[in-house]
Amino acid sequence: MIDTDMCHREPVSVRVEELIRAFEDLVAVDHLNFDIPAGRMTGFAGANGAGKTTTMRMIVGVLKPTSGQVLWSGRPITAEDRRTIGYMPEERGLYPKQPVIDQLVYLARIKGASTQTARTEAMEYLDRFGLADHAREQVQKLSLGNQQRIQVTASLLADPAVLILDEPFSGLDPVAVDAMADVLREKTAQGVPVLFSSHQLDLID
């Protein structure tokens, strides 16, 4: 079981308020408003090109809105707040030649975890997702579905205050989807707001 004692922060909520993002003549996001409440899992549905990824990038600070704002528990979000977000981007950013466990430990240490804590937590998630036997393998040697699970695992490490996951279930088999959903439900039970995107409406339901 993942150690829940790490979850020491007061639960936060996130609000997207009148967000607009234009790329020259194309308006990708137009006056968007929604809440990601503390302790809730929010599904973000839409076809490719609907603005899901653009919106997530604005929340985590990768893109600057044309106008509008992101609120963190009722106040404008800061760079320090954003450092506590567990983010899984649309573009998978794993280092293909690095062993899985080394990569996860490195990413967790960037977020402030100690080496021992990072290694313990990473191995617990790998075991839970059926990947413990692959911990020393290079990422590039894993199937795409297993790489997806590693990418999600990276976002879960180091006690994130908020989870923003872009297509986390893409390419996963039903068993892996259930395992991933169970972990996300546990996070929401701890008060963590979770936003995930999907083009599969059955997953949103």
Please provide the spans of the model-predicted regions.
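Helix-to-loop junction immediately C-terminal to a conserved catalytic motif
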Residues: 60
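Conserved ABC transporter NBD signature motif
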Residues: 68-81
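Conserved ABC ATPase "signature" region
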Residues: 105, 109, 117-134
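Conserved ABC ATPase signature
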Residues: 138-142
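Catalytic Walker B motif of ABC-type/P-loop ATPase nucleotide-binding domains
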Residues: 163-166
